[in-house]
Amino acid sequence: MDDKILEGTTTVGITCKDGVVFASERRASMGNLVAHKVAEKIFKINDHIVTTIAGSVGDAQNLMKIIEAEVSLYQMRNNDKISVKAAASVTANILRSGPMYVQTLLGGMDGDKPSLYSLDPAGGMIEDTYISTGSGSIVAYGVLEDRYHEEITTDEGLEIAVRAIKAASERDTFSGNGYLVAKVTKDGFEMLDKEKVNDIVAKI
């Protein structure tokens, strides 16, 4: 059964002084097969909330659609933006309601305040300053533990996140095929283009 499921692997999220940064590689695996080399693993929920996925691609895509709908519904009912913590709680409730083979990072900005949450397939929710998910996370955490400090900016955070994904891609056979990199600041969401990502990779 497991070799019939498309899986996404290594993702990273880091809180910074001025925002939250996210990075992932792009490989989707089916057992030992590299099924896709351009998998999307970072998703914009709205201008101040972003999620990443690791696990079953089908479950993850379904979860993203539900989160987007729930967040939009909240904002229509309350005529206000949903907080990052509330969006994480909504996601946790969705995961508790039915089995989904996916681990999600959800983070963003409430005004000037960055926050980041990890959500497991059973709906467990943990807030932290930096988090990695997926099969390459054990390698990525080595980089994060070594380089993270509380005063980092998003520019520094982007470099650390890419470095962590690069290390995971070199050691984990289920990670690789390039990078997706994004950030959220008080000015909104940005998915970095290929040129900016290549500039970061060149520095490390």
Swiss-Prot record:
The formation of the proteasomal ATPase PAN-20S proteasome complex, via the docking of the C-termini of PAN into the intersubunit pockets in the alpha-rings, triggers opening of the gate for substrate entry. Interconversion between the open-gate and close-gate conformations leads to a dynamic regulation of the 20S proteasome proteolysis activity. Belongs to the peptidase T1B family. This is Proteasome subunit beta. Residues 1-8 form a propeptide. It is an enzyme of class 3 (hydrolase). Its EC number is 3.4.25.1. It is found in: Cytoplasm. One of its GO terms (cellular component) is proteasome core complex, beta-subunit complex. Pfam families: Proteasome. NCBIfam families: arc_protsome_B. Disulfide bonds: none annotated. PROSITE patterns: PROTEASOME_BETA_1, PROTEASOME_BETA_2. The gene is psmB. It catalyses: Cleavage of peptide bonds with very broad specificity. One of its GO terms (molecular function) is threonine-type endopeptidase activity. It comes from Methanobrevibacter smithii (strain ATCC 35061 / DSM 861 / OCM 144 / PS). The 20S proteasome core is composed of 14 alpha and 14 beta subunits that assemble into four stacked heptameric rings, resulting in a barrel-shaped structure. The two inner rings, each composed of seven catalytic beta subunits, are sandwiched by two outer rings, each composed of seven alpha subunits. The catalytic chamber with the active sites is on the inside of the barrel. Has a gated structure, the ends of the cylinder being occluded by the N-termini of the alpha-subunits. Is capped at one or both ends by the proteasome regulatory ATPase, PAN.
